[in-house]
Amino acid sequence: MLAFFRFVVRWSWRLLLAVVLFFNCRLYWPSPLAQNTNQVPGALRQQLNANAKVLTSGAPHRMQQIFPEGFYFCHVLHGLTWIEAAQRDTSLTEEAIENAKLAYKNLDSQECRDTFPSDLPPDHGAFYSAWKVHLLAGIVMLQMQEGASKEIALTEKETDLAELQRLCDDWQRLFQDVPSPFFESYHGGIWPCDTLPAIHAMKTCDRITNQNKYQGTIDQWLKDVKQTLDSETGLIPHLNLADGKQTGQGRATSQMIILRMMPDIDEAFARQQYELFRERFLTTFGGIPCLYEYADGQGSSVGDVDTGPLVFGRSFSATVFMIGVGQLYDDQPVADAIAVAGEAVGLPWTWADEKRYVGGVLPIGDIMVAYSQNAKRWSDGQGHCPQERSSIASGWRWKVHLYSSPLFLLAVGLWWLSLIHI
């Protein structure tokens, strides 16, 4: 027994010291984010390669067993990542269109449709329909931009544009017929963030066609949304009742989708919402910037089907999305801090021109990281530089060193114990 104890002590301090030193040193590696919106992140190609491979090896089906929209999100986020990559680097346009159309085909499959209620308008409910038209809007946008192959048949462009307009028309009629800015994704379930991709698609369609066909609907939607804001946080709420009345405060998981889309819809409102959100939700964990799921951490610390597991009230899925949102609002220090820390915690591994995190055990997580690191606005704008830089992102590495110092001292203590007493 004594020999076993000696073995444990002698190797425990080595392992603990190695982990602490590796993690703290890893924080000084360069940020994986591109510092220029005309460049893609350095490892994006390797991430896309890895994600494409798992998408064809059953990962979406496995993720569907874990998350309610696992199959759907795997494909749609991968397609959107390609779209925004081509916006950063137009030389990727042709390849991006091909991959985004493949993602769209998977969303349009019967297997994917069967996950959602077929009787909910406008097409299998708000979630399914909104993200689908959002992806199609991105495809059509790329078909029209410089860098698109001239070999793309004119009929293909016309067909895709006509389909985009048809889907946007369906949404416009729904907004006109129903006295609510939000609609059911599932029977009895309304999540306001599920509508944002459709509004974003309508705005994109207007820009593509140089028309304002949907602007009146968008303006009325914004007016109605501002009447439903959560009185506690001033944000768009997480859940709404079927009659359109707000229930529940704004939450980080839904705010990440809302804030990701809003700059292309209404810059001023987006800026206001981001400032409110950052003030109440941005926090730290062990010194690393991250997000509370509930404002000021005053809510459930367990999590639910929307958030996944929470750690002391922190949402790691929302924190990953914050990498992209921070870039869109010119909050680069926060985005960089989360991204750099994620490279340390996620233990990325690049092999055979493929990059995966934590050995690729959670493919949807890898897809979310690529989507977030590659975030790009779909329209030109004035930027959203926060009025004040976040103090949380200032000197955050030193805070991590401070919080991890007890583990370092424990390793030293075990080392001393192994030398002196055994």
Residue ranges and their predicted role:
Residues 18-84, 98-112, 155, 159-172, ...:
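Low-complexity, Ser/Thr/Pro/Gly-enriched N-terminal "stalk/linker" regions
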Residues 30-45, 85-101, 139-165, 206-219, ...:
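Structural helix-adjacent loops and short alpha-helical linkers that scaffold large soluble proteins
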Residues 67-70, 74-76, 80-196, 374:
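Extended ligand-binding groove/face enriched in aromatic
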Residues 127, 158-159, 178-180, 188-317:
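Extended ligand-binding clefts on enzyme/binding-domain cores
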Residues 388-408:
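Juxtamembrane/start-of-transmembrane alpha-helix segments at the extracytoplasmic/lumenal side
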Residues 420-422:
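Conserved small/polar residues in nucleotide/adenosyl-binding loops
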